[in-house]
């Protein structure tokens, strides 16, 4: 059983998944910082510094924290926008790389043969 587990754990896709989870956690910190440290203060300036999280209603002596719910919705949309922008930049960089790779024309069969003939003739003349 130990050998089977070891074989399973050492397979490439399990290790790839573990790396993805760790990178995802690190990326979460980046996105949260972008939202909390950049977007939220800017949004606060736009909406006049309103903090939704303190809004609540008392119903039969129970506090309903609907403001926190609103705050989480705003955070969700800001995180979604941040992720969209990050993915858009990454996609643009990948497209630019693909364009660069596509810009290098691959020689046709004729060009390859002519190059080989040229190289052979050059070697004979030496």
From Swiss-Prot:
Pfam families: MscL. Keywords: Cell membrane, Ion channel, Ion transport, Membrane, Transmembrane, Transmembrane helix, Transport. It is found in: Cell membrane. The chain crosses the membrane at residues 8-28, 70-90. InterPro entries: Mechanosensitive_channel_CS (IPR019823), MS_channel (IPR001185), MSC/AndL (IPR037673), MscL_channel (IPR036019). Its main location: membrane. GO terms for molecular function: mechanosensitive monoatomic ion channel activity. GO terms for cellular component: plasma membrane. It is a multi-pass membrane protein. Homopentamer. Channel that opens in response to stretch forces in the membrane lipid bilayer. May participate in the regulation of osmotic pressure changes within the cell. Belongs to the MscL family. This is Large-conductance mechanosensitive channel. It comes from Exiguobacterium sp. (strain ATCC BAA-1283 / AT1b).
């Amino acid at each position: 059983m130990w050998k089977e587990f070891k074989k399973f754990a050492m397979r490439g896709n399990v290790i790839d998944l573990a790396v993805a989870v760790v990178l995802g956690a690190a990326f979460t910190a980046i996105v949260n910082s972008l939202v909390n440290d950049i977007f939220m203060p800017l949004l606060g300036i736009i909406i006049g510094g309103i903090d939704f999280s303190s809004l609540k209603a008392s119903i039969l002596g129970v506090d309903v924290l609907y403001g926190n719910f609103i705050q989480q919705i705003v955070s969700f949309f800001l995180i979604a926008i941040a992720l969209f922008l990050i993915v858009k930049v990454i996609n643009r960089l990948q497209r630019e790389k693909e364009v660069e790779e596509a810009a290098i024309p691959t020689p046709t069969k004729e060009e390859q043969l002519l190059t080989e003939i040229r190289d052979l003739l050059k070697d004979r003349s030496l």
